[in-house]
Each structure stands twice: as C-alpha cells, then as structure tokens.
A protein has these predicted regions:
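SIR2/sirtuin NAD+-dependent deacylase catalytic core
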Residues: 1-175
Length: 175
C-alpha cells in the first residue's frame, strides 16, 4: 500500500483550471459586485489572487466603513453611526465572505465536471491519499474509494460541504 499526498499540482497536471486566478475569473463573471469589493477593499497589489488564502486577512475594514458611511450621507467616519449601521457593515464584510465561500464551492463543483485531458500514470487504487484539494479528481477519474481519501480542507462535492479556505486569522469564522 502506498500513501499519496495530493495538492493543486495534481489537478494542474491534469489541465484543470484550478488556480486562484481561475477562481478570480469565475467570481468576476459570476458577481462583478463581489469582485469589485475584493479588488477595492483587500490589500490588492495585483498579486491578491496569487496568495488568495493568505490575503483574506487583509481586508481594509476602515476604508470599507468610511465608504459605507459616505454612501449613507455621512462624512466618512462617525463613532455613533457605527452601531446604527452595524447590519450594513456585517452585510458587506461577513456577507461578502459568505458569498465568496459559496462561489468557491460552485467553482470547484464545476471543475469536478470537466474531463481530464491526460491522466497521471501509476495511481494505485488500494492506496491511501491525503488531499489538500477541494476537487474529487481522485474519485471521479481514478475511481479511488472515498474512504481512502482524507480531504484536509474539505470536499466540495459533499452535500453538507464545509470547505476550509484561507488562514487561521478569520475572525468571522467563515473560512
């Protein structure tokens, strides 16, 4: 019996569009509003999507709050307004994170439907697998028993999917 440790390189080897740049394109097409918030309020240097998981902690909350207050007729910062508009802030922060996670699940499920243009040789079905991927490439294309696969970050194909995306600095506990 062998032990395989599988990461995104495995899906990339099979020509699956599974980079975070591919996810960026998916979000941009699916929801330009959420995409715009990400581009504007995260520490966006052009490389945000390259280090997507790490950069999730870089939300510029103060700029977001100032912009929301201005859009509601305020001057950009008002301590008293913070409490009154708390549901709006939650929508823009937690709501966007939740939507982003839902898009991640949709995107991975779409990846799971794609055919492989080539197959990695030498995968032994009776082996054990540790997978850092969200995709079901091993199950779908190599017919690996799901009981032989430990999905470290979750499996998007499961009905009650709870993907782990990002870092341990997620104060909202969404990712």
């Amino acid at each position: 019996m062998k032990l395989y440790i599988i990461g995104n390189g495995f899906d990339l080897y099979h020509h699956l569009p599974s980079t975070y740049y591919d996810f960026r394109d998916f979000v941009k097409e699916k929801d330009p509003f959420v995409f715009g918030i990400i581009e504007k309020y995260f520490d966006y240097t052009g490389a945000f999507w390259h280090a997507f998981e790490e950069n999730l902690s870089e939300l510029d909350e103060f700029q977001l709050i100032r912009d929301i207050l201005r859009s509601l007729g305020g001057d950009g910062w008002d301590e008293d307004a913070l409490e009154s508009y708390d549901p709006i802030f939650e929508y823009y922060t937690i709501g966007v994170f939740c939507q982003l996670k839902n898009y991640m699940i949709d995107w991975v499920r779409n990846l799971n439907l794609l055919p492989l243009s080539r197959k990695y040789p030498g995968i032994y079905p009776d082996s054990l697998f540790i997978s850092f991927n969200y995709t079901n490439t091993l199950e779908r294309h190599f017919h690996i028993d799901p009981n032989h696969i430990n999905y470290i970050h979750g499996n998007a194909q499961k009905e009650a999917c709870d993907l782990i995306v990002g870092h341990d600095m997620d104060n909202s506990n969404i990712f």
